[in-house]
C-alpha cells in the first residue's frame, strides 16, 4: 500500500461512520446495528428512515432518501439537474480526477455531490439543498458550490426560507483553489439572503467537516444537527497532536456542540419534517404558491 493509499483509507474510515451491516445468510432481509448489536428486519429499518428502533442509531441515507424524508410527497422540483463537473486542472494523484468523477457518477446516478430544488414542507415553500456523501465523500467542488449558490439566489429572489443538508469531508482537493473559492461565494450569497430577512437553516449530518464546516454549515440562523453526527474542521488526531492534549470522548459530536453553543437543536431523523414545519411557521412562513 502506498503512502497516499494509507492516508486515503484512514480519512475514509474516519468519516464514513457506522452503517447497518447485513447478517450472515440473511439474503439481505436482516441487518445488525453496529451500535447496540440488535438484529433488525431491514424492511422495518427502511420504514424507520434507517434509524435503529432499539438504540436510535442513525445510519447513512442517500440524497434521494433524504429528500423523500423531508418534503411533502411530489412537491420537490429539482434545479440545475444537468450541471456537471469537469477536470479544469487535469488533476491526477494515483488516479485521474476525471476517472474518479465517472466512477462516482456511475455508482450514484448523480452528476455531482449535491441535489438542489424547491419543495414544500407541511405545505410551506422551501429552497432545499441535500449533499450526498456517496459522491467523492460529499466533497465541495465548483459544481457543488455553483448549485448551492444558485439555489440561495433563487431563495432570495423568491423570498423563500432555505435548508441545506450538509454531509461532506470538505473542499475537493482535485479542484484546488476553484474548490476553496466556493466557500466565499456561498457565504456571500447567504449574506444577501440574510439581508433580505429570510431564514436559513443548515442541517449537519454525519459527517460535516473541513471547508463546509468553515463556511455555510455554520452560518445559519438556526443550526440543526442529527444525533451523534461528527461535526468539525480538522480531524481529532490532528488536534490532539497539535494541542498535546487528550480530547473528550464526545468531542466533535452534535451533542458536544449543542452543549457548547455551536448547535441550536438536535433533531432525530424521524421527527425532522414535523420539526421543520414548526420552525418555519414560528418564523412567519405560510402556505403560498411558488414558481420555478
From Swiss-Prot:
Residues 29-292 form the CoA carboxyltransferase N-terminal domain. SUPFAM superfamilies: ClpP/crotonase. A zinc finger (C4-type) spans 33-55. Binds 1 zinc ion per subunit. PROSITE patterns: COA_CT_NTER. GO terms for biological process: fatty acid biosynthetic process; malonyl-CoA biosynthetic process. It comes from Prochlorococcus marinus (strain SARG / CCMP1375 / SS120). Component of the acetyl coenzyme A carboxylase (ACC) complex. Biotin carboxylase (BC) catalyzes the carboxylation of biotin on its carrier protein (BCCP) and then the CO(2) group is transferred by the transcarboxylase to acetyl-CoA to form malonyl-CoA. This is Acetyl-coenzyme A carboxylase carboxyl transferase subunit beta. Its EC number is 2.1.3.15. The keyword Mitochondrion does not apply. It is found in: Cytoplasm. The lineage of its organism: Bacteria, Bacillati, Cyanobacteriota, Cyanophyceae, Synechococcales.
Amino acid at each position: 500500500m502506498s503512502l497516499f493509499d494509507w492516508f486515503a483509507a484512514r480519512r475514509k474510515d474516519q468519516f464514513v461512520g457506522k452503517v447497518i451491516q447485513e447478517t450472515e445468510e440473511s439474503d439481505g432481509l436482516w441487518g445488525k446495528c453496529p451500535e447496540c448489536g440488535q438484529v433488525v428486519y431491514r424492511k422495518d429499518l427502511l420504514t424507520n428512515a434507517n434509524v435503529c428502533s432499539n438504540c436510535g442509531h442513525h445510519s447513512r441515507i442517500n440524497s434521494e432518501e433524504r429528500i423523500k424524508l423531508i418534503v411533502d410527497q411530489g412537491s420537490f422540483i429539482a434545479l440545475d439537474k444537468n450541471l456537471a463537473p469537469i477536470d479544469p486542472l487535469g488533476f491526477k494523484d494515483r488516479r485521474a480526477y476525471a476517472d474518479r468523477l465517472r466512477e462516482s457518477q456511475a455508482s450514484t446516478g448523480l452528476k455531482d455531490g449535491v441535489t438542489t430544488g424547491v419543495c414544500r414542507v407541511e405545505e410551506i415553500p422551501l429552497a432545499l439543498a441535500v449533499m450526498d456523501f456517496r459522491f467523492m465523500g460529499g466533497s465541495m467542488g465548483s459544481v457543488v458550490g455553483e448549485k448551492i449558490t444558485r439555489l440561495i439566489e433563487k431563495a432570495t429572489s423568491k423570498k423563500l426560507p432555505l435548508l441545506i443538508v450538509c454531509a461532506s469531508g470538505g473542499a475537493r482537493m482535485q479542484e484546488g483553489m476553484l474548490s476553496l473559492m466556493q466557500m466565499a461565494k456561498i457565504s456571500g450569497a447567504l449574506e444577501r439572503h440574510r439581508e433580505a430577512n429570510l431564514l436559513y437553516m443548515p442541517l449537519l449530518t454525519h459527517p460535516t467537516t473541513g471547508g463546509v464546516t468553515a463556511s455555510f454549515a455554520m452560518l445559519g440562523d438556526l443550526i440543526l444537527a442529527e444525533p451523534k453526527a461528527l461535526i468539525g474542521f480538522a480531524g481529532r488526531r490532528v488536534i490532539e497532536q497539535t494541542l498535546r492534549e487528550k480530547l473528550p470522548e464526545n468531542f466533535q459530536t452534535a451533542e458536544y456542540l449543542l452543549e457548547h453553543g455551536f448547535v441550536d437543536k438536535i433533531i432525530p431523523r424521524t421527527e425532522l419534517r414535523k420539526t421543520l414545519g414548526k420552525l418555519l411557521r414560528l418564523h412567519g412562513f405560510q402556505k403560498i404558491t411558488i414558481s420555478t
